[in-house]
């Protein structure tokens, strides 16, 4: 039986044909729009929002996610340009009654400093599952997931792609397949290992279904946990923890790297654990906690 096509694909194809026929866009530009808008429309679909009903807040949340996954400012600017053109097209063609992207502006092409939690905020967030549902079915899953994200600094896509074969808990390592299927070994602390073992032994066997396969983190139906579900779990626990900063699964990665560097970890070692191909991508974490840098200067500089 053929897979049902998402309704937004037809709208996207109509827009791309308009770009080619009416505005003489090149094949490369068309391909860029296909990639950028495909990601945006798939995200809206996963959120349960139709393109013609999107609000400015939806677009801003999507742009925030682009920041959180580490997309360069120039790429984000290109995405915004595509989104603005798309919604303008929907309004012109009377496929929508408003243009939610009209007042969405291009970011300045400067380095984006990601949101990072303090060590105290992270501790509060990691305890939130115990406060939210200490006797609930999903407490073990949510607690294990949050602890694992912070302990390893893995991307959410890497987390959701984990299988039992990737875990080497007796050795204190996890095998991760990152961007471009690049493989790396990342250490896992004992606290995260303890919660992962409890989840895997006490909860996951009862959650499994025919669609579970070997995926570590499962949803309530026994299928693989989706990216959006992981986002919701993080945000719901952030509310419980009283954290008002913008937060996503990627915040754990940013905080992981920042806290390691604050503790004196070597930049190259952190680069290896994060799976960055370039040291430049890791260096951003040396510029985040200005208060920490000031404190170091005050403590160690003779004129501090």
UniProtKB/Swiss-Prot annotation:
Protein keywords: Cell cycle, Cell division, Chromosome partition, Cytoplasm, DNA integration, DNA recombination, DNA-binding
GO molecular function list: DNA binding; tyrosine-based site-specific recombinase activity
GO terms classed as biological process: cell division; chromosome segregation; DNA transposition
One term under GO cellular component: cytoplasm
InterPro entries documented for this protein: CB, DNA_brk_join_enz, Integrase-like_cat_sf, Integrase_catalytic, Integrase_recombinase_N, Integrase_SAM-like_N, Recomb_XerD, Tyrosine_recombinase_XerC/XerD
Annotated Core-binding (CB) domain residues: 6-91
Residue ranges annotated for the Tyr recombinase domain, each copy included: 112-298
Residues annotated as catalytic: 155, 179, 250, 253, 276, 285 (o-(3'-phospho-dna)-tyrosine intermediate)
A family per Pfam: Phage_integrase
Keyword Transport: no
Alphabetized Gene3D superfamilies for the sequence: 1.10.150.130, Intergrase catalytic core
Keyword Zinc in record: no
Signal peptide interval: none
Functional summary from the UniProt entry: Site-specific tyrosine recombinase, which acts by catalyzing the cutting and rejoining of the recombining DNA molecules. The XerC-XerD complex is essential to convert dimers of the bacterial chromosome into monomers to permit their segregation at cell division. It also contributes to the segregational stability of plasmids.
NCBIfam families in UniProt: PRK00283.1, recomb_XerD
Similarity-based family: Belongs to the 'phage' integrase family. XerD subfamily.
Protein name: Tyrosine recombinase XerD
Taxonomy of the source species: Bacteria, Pseudomonadati, Chlorobiota, Chlorobiia, Chlorobiales
């Amino acid at each position: 039986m053929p897979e049902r096509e998402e309704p937004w694909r037809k709208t996207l194809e109509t827009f791309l044909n308009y770009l080619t026929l009416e505005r003489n866009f090149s094949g490369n530009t068309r391909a860029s729009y296909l990639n950028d808008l495909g990601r945006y429309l798939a995200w809206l679909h996963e959120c349960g929002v139709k393109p013609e009903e999107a609000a400015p807040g939806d677009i801003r949340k999507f742009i925030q996610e682009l920041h959180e996954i580490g997309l360069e400012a120039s790429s984000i600017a290109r995405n915004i340009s595509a989104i603005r053109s798309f919604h303008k097209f929907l309004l012109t063609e009377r496929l929508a009654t408003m243009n939610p992207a009209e007042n969405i502006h291009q970011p300045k092409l400067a380095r984006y400093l990601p949101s990072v939690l303090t060590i105290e905020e992270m501790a509060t967030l990691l305890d939130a599952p115990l406060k939210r549902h200490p006797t609930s079915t999903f407490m073990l899953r949510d607690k294990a997931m949050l602890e694992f994200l912070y302990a390893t600094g893995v991307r959410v896509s890497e987390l959701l792609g984990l299988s039992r074969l990737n875990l080497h808990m007796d050795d204190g390592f996890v095998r991760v397949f990152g961007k471009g299927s690049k493989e790396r070994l990342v250490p896992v602390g004992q606290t995260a290992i303890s919660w992962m073992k409890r989840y895997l032994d006490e909860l996951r066997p009862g959650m499994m279904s025919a669609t579970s396969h070997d995926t570590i983190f499962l949803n309530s139906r026994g299928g693989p946990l989706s990216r959006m579900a992981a986002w919701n779990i993080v945000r719901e626990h952030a509310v419980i923890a009283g954290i008002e900063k913008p937060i996503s699964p990627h915040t754990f990665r940013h905080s992981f790297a920042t806290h390691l560097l604050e503790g004196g970890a070597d930049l190259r070692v952190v680069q290896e654990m994060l799976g960055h191909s370039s040291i430049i991508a890791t260096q951003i974490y040396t510029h985040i906690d200005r208060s920490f840098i000031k404190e170091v200067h005050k403590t160690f500089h003779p004129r501090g």
